[in-house]
From Swiss-Prot:
Its main location: membrane. A lipid is attached at C20 (N-palmitoyl cysteine). One of its GO terms (cellular component) is plasma membrane. Coiled coil: none annotated. Belongs to the TrbL/VirB6 family. Keywords: Cell membrane, Lipoprotein, Membrane, Palmitate, Signal, Transmembrane, Transmembrane helix. Residues 1-19 form the signal peptide. It is a multi-pass membrane protein; Lipid-anchor. One of its GO terms (biological process) is protein secretion by the type IV secretion system. A lipid is attached at C20 (S-diacylglycerol cysteine). This is Uncharacterized lipoprotein RF_0093. It is found in: Cell membrane.
């Protein structure tokens, strides 16, 4: 069921995403274009006026930078006559004749119905160009009119390191490339076409600018600006809607790229972990001393070998040795070490890899849309076209399902590739951290292989992402081509039902929010044209929207001479409705579209084949990189030189070198390992915090796992139905309301206070309101006043509910982790048969493990007993002192001597006994789990025991209480003996070694741990909840009893007759037709109070029994310590702990006491 819900939510989210395009219609080549609006109006403070009618306005920054490819910008068409609306979401025209301040995105009413401007001889070239010498006005033949198709709009590719808005002169004559977007594209041999809001293909304005000569590299990564140029802006109205189809670097966020940049910043940023750790290593005095020693030895051995003639020191060899000494010497310069090695070595493995991957990704982006394949597949435009197939072809549903399946696999394959890349990135960082150690190893032959292996690993992990993403890019190109060919048609929204007159009232407002909400909140996408037929398709010369190769007669025999065209670089004749399909090569697909067959199943088949290839390539990329790096030869031999053998000198060299290598590696490697562990813990802790936070939210949400909830109910006794999911928020809101009435309430934060218990909260509020230390320091009058404020705010009950909800969240997390620890994975938590099988496997493995441990323990116990007999006999013969002197050779002393690595300093035989108790605890827990599973409830919880006792199952209560007592003893002892500050050390240590102060500290520690155990026990923590329930029920019953007593003038009323007396009292005091309803309501309230009183009384008594059991066990350990003190002739220290609990009376006894 949960799986079906997940699939439903996934499809629903994709459907929702498909409606987030913000457009009424989507062009055939739109798979996620960058859209930008340019207004014809400016704020008065932005405009500079030199003289009347000569205003200069700033250029609008698009926030994008050009990338050197053809810059293609289209201006949306707009026609009021054809049905387009004068709204911010549809308007793409401006009027230079009339406008007001509020006409930044709409036309003035005067201009709406004006005709588009026409020009004498279509001369638009010299119209208001950004040139001070040009004073010409546009040669308009039909004023007044509106400007459309980009007339008057210019783009600016600003020169690098320049700001076109720094001064009025730079605004008028900026440095860079400026072009007018309103020129007739037909003059250059092509046309722009776009689908209007009414679903018609209309000619559009725009420009396709292709760089000349060196401009491509000169202006790469330069900012792009736009501006409507006019001489007087104050009377303008309207805007242009632009679509940037190509030529800019897409800076829109990609989730996986964001994750990569985040981790890279943490590791390799300016203050990254890698740099800090690297500098800490080279700053270590011991490391610097070791490097100095290595250099000294290397120079000494080089001189010695040259003097005795063992090496032929040629010019090349001398240069090589000097370079080695120079490189290693840099490690001694802490200021320059990181800068040198990062800028000349490590940068190739960090930024170099990133640049290569960027080049690969750009090469793989063969058309419009996101550079990321995943971004293309889930873009709103792509999904809108995909879901439009549902009602135009009976195969549409099948295609959509197959597409979603393919999307699922592609997501996980790309995610896997990203994880491989991040792993390689982190590993490169770790290898770089170890660089100061391994760079020193390049000096000597005996350690050179270590340096070579270090460098090979660095190269291997740098190659892995390159090879991996090169393969992904290749497969991505195939998938992109199929997506473009299959879904490269236009779509429009069709509303149902149309709101008609209502739209006239609310349509403009809704369109200002989202242009897609103009007519109805219900809609669906349909292809344009929706029907087949050759008359619905039109040919024209257009810019080809994807990378392709032009094959003509000049290159048929030599394919290398064929021209490669980038997207929107070359012109071809194609159907404007199917711009990605070549008229010759794709004739079959074009025929299918014309005949109304929009679904191309052969395309989805090719996508699945590509996914299979991608999965295989992911598995081989790492081994390929390792193969290349492992067979690249000796990477450190700059040039081979002749060396004579000097075996005798080499043998003498190896001794000090081995010592020096060990001296360098041990302390530094230890520090590096610590830093690496710290780094890994940083990511592990962050991931764990995210997962725990997710589980906490899941526990209180509708997506909570039913299997985990049942586990919580069985093992922790908390039913999710009893949990108030908004209790934490209600508690925080209640505190906020109380703080508003405090004179210094603004000094406290409600969120921090909501994490406290009620008593701690009361102390804080007392200190804030009255300036005292805590609640106990208040006078009686102040206490009554504060208690009334807290009671009016109902904070005690809210705090109890919030703590109960937090306990449930913790139990949910623990149950989820416990199920995972037992081998119950994600599918097991949702599929009951699989979960049962996994649980059974875990129980079998646990029993097998315990059986094996018991068998080993029995053997060790027998041997320990045998050695104990020998030890006792030796003591009787030679005495204790002589035994201790010779015990190691006679009686296996390791069984009876202290384990100094043990925090409790036990002997091995004592540890065996404790291990046996630990096995008993595990066996007991398995038995309790079995009983819990059978009862489908937490058999140890006070609530369950109270219900059993109420049902008269006293034998079961006694049995479960005996199990609870045994488990509680194990838990208390485990808490007392845990590492850190154990309450009890080993028996031999306590008898022979423990001092007076040590034993006093142990007893003090026992008192502290007793309080912590009571405070943290999951059963005793519920006392406040049932205290409130008991007090409410008790108060209501006392009030009812008093009213009956006063009404009937009786002192001998018992509980059994109270319902009849309540009914009689209402009949005596009330009249009218509502008497019966009143009687029913009062009796229901009385019965509920009786039930709550009796239930809470039983539960609270069980909780008190548990607290007393905890106290008794802690006292038993304190008594044992005092026995050791008595045997050592020490005085008894402090009295045992006393549990100050109370036993509540039954309801009959309580009412009897009121008479």
């Amino acid at each position: 069921m949960n799986k079906n819900i997940f699939i439903t939510l996934l499809i629903s989210s994709l459907l929702l995403l498909s409606g987030c395009t913000g457009d009424t219609c989507i062009d055939p080549d739109d798979f996620g274009f960058i859209k930008f609006n340019v207004s014809s109006r400016y704020n008065p403070e932005e405009i500079t006026s030199r003289q009347e009618g000569d205003q200069v306005a700033p250029w609008r920054d698009s926030a994008y930078k050009v990338n050197g490819y053809p810059l293609t910008v289209m201006v949306r068409p707009w026609s009021y006559i054809l049905g387009d609306k004068n709204t911010s979401g549809q308007l793409s025209a401006w009027c230079p004749w009339y406008g007001q301040k509020n006409n930044t995105t709409t036309l003035a009413a005067f201009c709406v119905k004006l005709q588009p401007c026409t020009f004498w001889d279509n001369a638009r070239l010299d119209m208001c160009t950004p040139n001070p010498a040009n004073q010409n006005d546009a040669m308009i033949s039909n004023p007044p009119c509106i400007m459309t198709d980009g007339v008057g709009l210019y783009f600016l590719i600003a020169a690098k390191n320049t700001d076109p808005n720094i001064s009025p002169d730079s605004q008028r004559k900026p440095q860079g490339i400026t072009q007018h977007l309103g020129e007739l594209t037909s003059s250059v041999g092509y046309e722009f076409y776009s689908i209007s809001s009414t679903g018609q293909f209309l000619p559009a304005g725009g420009i396709n600018y292709q760089y000349k000569g060196e401009d491509k590299s000169k202006y790469a990564q330069s900012p792009l600006y736009f501006k409507i140029i006019d001489k007087f802006y104050d009377d303008n109205s309207g805007q242009y809607r632009l679509v940037i189809k190509s030529g800019v670097t897409d800076t829109r966020p990609d989730p996986l790229q964001f994750l990569t940049d985040l981790i890279k910043g943490v590791l390799f940023g300016k203050d990254g972990i890698i740099k800090k750790t690297y500098q800490q290593i080279i700053d270590t005095p011991g490391y610097r001393m070791s490097v100095s020693a290595i250099l000294t030895l290397y120079i000494m051995f080089t001189g010695f070998s040259f003097l005795i003639g063992n090496i032929n020191l040629t010019h090349v060899e001398l240069i090589v040795r000097i370079l080695k000494v120079s490189i290693v010497s840099i490690l001694l310069s802490t200021d320059k070490a990181w800068t040198f090695f990062h800028d000349y070595l490590f940068v190739f493995f960090i930024d170099g890899v990133q640049q290569i991957l960027q080049i690969i990704n750009e090469a793989a982006a063969t058309g419009p849309g996101s550079q990321s394949l995943l971004g293309l597949l889930i873009s709103p435009q792509t999904l809108s076209k995909l879901f439009s197939l549902l009602f135009v072809d009976w195969l549409g549903f099948i295609y959509i399902i197959l597409y979603l399946i393919a999307l699922y696999f592609i997501f996980f394959l790309i995610f896997k590739a990203t994880i491989i890349y991040l792993t390689a990135l982190i590993t490169i960082g770790m290898i770089i951290i170890m660089g100061p150690i391994f760079i020193c190893f390049m000096l000597f032959n005996i350690t050179r292989s270590l340096f070579e292996n270090w460098l090979r690993q660095l190269i291997s992990y740098a190659l892995q992402p390159i090879i991996l993403f090169a393969g992904i890019a290749f497969i991505s190109m195939i998938i992109r081509t199929e997506i473009y060919s299959t879904l490269g048609f236009g779509v429009c929204k069709h509303d149902f039902p149309n709101l008609g007159p209502i739209n006239e009232i609310f349509g403009s407002f809704l369109e200002d929010i989202d242009p897609s909400l103009g007519n109805s909140i219900f809609y669906w996408w349909f292809p344009v044209p929706m029907k087949g037929g050759i008359n619905n398709f039109h040919k024209a010369k257009i810019l080809v929207p994807e990378d392709h190769i032009i094959v003509d007669d000049s290159c048929k025999n030599d394919p290398d001479k064929c021209k490669h065209c980038a997207a929107y670089e070359c012109i071809d004749e194609r159907y404007i409705e199917l711009p990605f399909l070549d008229l010759v090569k794709d004739a079959k697909r074009i025929s299918n579209f014309i005949n109304g067959k929009f679904v191309q199943l052969d395309g989805i088949l090719l996508i699945f084949v590509s996914i299979y290839l991608l999965s295989k390539f992911n598995d081989t990329a790492i081994s390929t990189a390792q193969f290349i790096a492992g067979t690249s030869g000796n990477l450190t031999d700059i040039q081979k030189v002749n060396q004579q053998s000097y075996e005798s000198a080499a043998k003498q060299m190896n001794r000090p070198l081995s010592y020096v290598a060990k001296t360098v590696s041990v302390p530094v490697t230890t520090r590096v390992s610590a830093k690496l562990e710290e780094t890994s813990m940083f990511f592990a802790k962050g991931f764990e915090d995210i997962m725990m936070g997710r589980l906490e939210k899941q526990a209180l949400g509708s997506s909570a796992n039913k299997a985990v909830q049942n586990e919580v109910k069985r093992k922790y006794g908390i039913d999710s139905k009893d949990v108030k999911m908004n209790a934490i928020t209600d508690y925080e809101n209640g505190i906020s309301g109380l703080l508003k009435n405090l004179p210094k309430g603004n000094e406290l934060k409600a969120k921090e206070l909501s994490q406290m218990k009620f008593t701690q909260l009361r102390d804080k509020i007392a200190a804030n309101k009255y300036g005292v230390k805590d609640y106990a320091a208040l006078s009686e009058e102040q206490k009554r006043e504060l208690d009334k404020s807290l009671k009016d705010a109902n904070l005690r009950e809210l705090a109890s509910d919030a703590n109960f909800t937090k306990d449930y969240q913790d139990a949910y997390k623990y149950a989820h982790q416990e199920m995972s620890g037992r081998g119950v994975g994600l599918f097991g938590k949702n599929i009951k048969p699989l979960r049962s099988w996994q649980e059974m496997e875990h129980r079998v493995d646990t029993k097998r493990k315990l059986k094996e441990e018991r068998r080993v323990g029995i053997g060790e116990k027998l041997y320990a007993g045998y050695t104990g007999i020998k030890r006792g006999a030796l003591t009787a013969i030679v005495g204790k002192d002589l035994r201790d002197a010779y015990e190691g050779n006679l009686t296996s002393a390791e069984w009876h001597d202290f384990e100094y690595n043990d925090p409790r300093l036990r002997t091995y035989s004592e540890k065996l006994k404790d291990d046996e108790k630990a096995r008993e605890r595990e066996e007991l827990q398995m038995h309790i789990n079995k009983e819990t599973l059978a009862a489908q409830a937490d058999i140890l919880s006070p609530e369950y025991l109270a219900r059993l006792e109420k049902a008269g199952r006293q034998s079961d209560v006694e049995y479960y209480q005996e199990l609870a007592q045994r488990k509680l003893i194990h838990e208390v002892r485990g808490r007392l003996f845990e590492e850190g500050e154990p309450v009890m050390m080993g028996d031999r240590f306590m008898r022979e070694k423990a001092t007076d102060s040590q034993m006093r500290d142990m007893i003090d520690n026992a008192h502290r741990k007793h309080a912590e155990f009571i405070e943290g026990d999951r059963y005793t923590r519920r006392q406040e909840h049932y205290d409130i329930m008991h007090e409410k029920a008790e108060g209501n019953l006392e009030q009812t009893y008093k009213e009956l007593k006063d009404h009937f003038k009786r002192d001998d009323i018992n509980i059994e007759e109270m319902p009849a007396l309540i009914a009689q009292k209402i009949k005596d005091t009330e009249q009218g037709p509502e008497v019966d309803a009143k009687i029913t309501e009062e009796l229901n309230n009385f019965n509920a109070d009786v039930k709550n009183y009796e239930y809470s009384t039983e539960v609270l008594n069980k909780i008190e029994d548990r607290k007393q059991a905890i106290t008794d066990e802690v006292n038993a350990q304190i008594d044992q310590i005092n026995k050791y003190r008595e045997n050592a002739k020490m005085e008894k220290y402090v009295r045992p702990i006393v549990n100050e609990g109370r036993k509540l009376r039954k309801l009959e006894d309580h009412l009897r006491g009121m008479k």
